Amino acid sequence: MNTVLSVQGASAPVEKKSFFSKFTRLNMLRLVRAVIPVAVLMMLFPELAMAAGKGDLMAKGNDTVKATFGKDSSIVKWVVLAEVLVGAVMYMMTKNVKFLVGFAIISVFIAVGMSVVGL
């Protein structure tokens, strides 16, 4: 795409650079030169990179998460209620059954996801 740049009445076409022009060989080499030292350090010190051997770092908050998002928590009930209300309103506005089915599918995914993570 060409644009026109005018300075005091004179005009010269200026070609707009493409997004892909940033992915040159020199820029890729600069990126690799920045990423390789970090990757090597992560390989040499995996205990720092992944907290290996430290046990479960999030175990302390497990009870809090289960109390907040567990099966009998009020947040789950409010989320399901919000899904039903939004689905009903969207159906009434558009008269499209896909919204009702979509929110039912989202409810199933949320229930399955919570059972997978153990809530």
Swiss-Prot record:
<comment type="similarity">
    <text>Belongs to the TraA family.</text>
</comment>
<keyword id="KW-0614">Plasmid</keyword>
<feature type="topological domain" description="Periplasmic">
    <location>
        <begin position="1"/>
        <end position="73"/>
    </location>
</feature>
<keyword id="KW-0007">Acetylation</keyword>
<keyword id="KW-0964">Secreted</keyword>
<keyword id="KW-0812">Transmembrane</keyword>
<comment type="subunit">
    <text>Monomer. Interacts with itself to form filaments; also interacts with TraQ.</text>
</comment>
<feature type="transmembrane region" description="Helical">
    <location>
        <begin position="99"/>
        <end position="119"/>
    </location>
</feature>
<keyword id="KW-1003">Cell membrane</keyword>
<dbReference type="GO" id="GO:0005576">
    <property type="term" value="C:extracellular region"/>
</dbReference>
<dbReference type="GO" id="GO:0005886">
    <property type="term" value="C:plasma membrane"/>
</dbReference>
<keyword id="KW-0997">Cell inner membrane</keyword>
<keyword id="KW-1133">Transmembrane helix</keyword>
<comment type="function">
    <text>Propilin is the precursor of the pilus subunit, pilin, that forms conjugative pili, the filamentous surface appendages required for cell-to-cell contact during the earlier stages of bacterial conjugation, and that retract after contact is established. Mature pilin is assembled with the help of TraQ and TraX.</text>
</comment>
<dbReference type="InterPro" id="IPR008873">
    <property type="entry name" value="TraA"/>
</dbReference>
<feature type="modified residue" description="N-acetylalanine">
    <location>
        <position position="52"/>
    </location>
</feature>
<keyword id="KW-0184">Conjugation</keyword>
<feature type="transmembrane region" description="Helical">
    <location>
        <begin position="74"/>
        <end position="94"/>
    </location>
</feature>
<keyword id="KW-0472">Membrane</keyword>
<protein>
    <recommendedName>
        <fullName>Pilin</fullName>
    </recommendedName>
</protein>
<dbReference type="Pfam" id="PF05513">
    <property type="entry name" value="TraA"/>
</dbReference>
<feature type="topological domain" description="Cytoplasmic">
    <location>
        <begin position="95"/>
        <end position="98"/>
    </location>
</feature>
<feature type="propeptide" description="Leader peptide; cleaved by LepB">
    <location>
        <begin position="1"/>
        <end position="51"/>
    </location>
</feature>
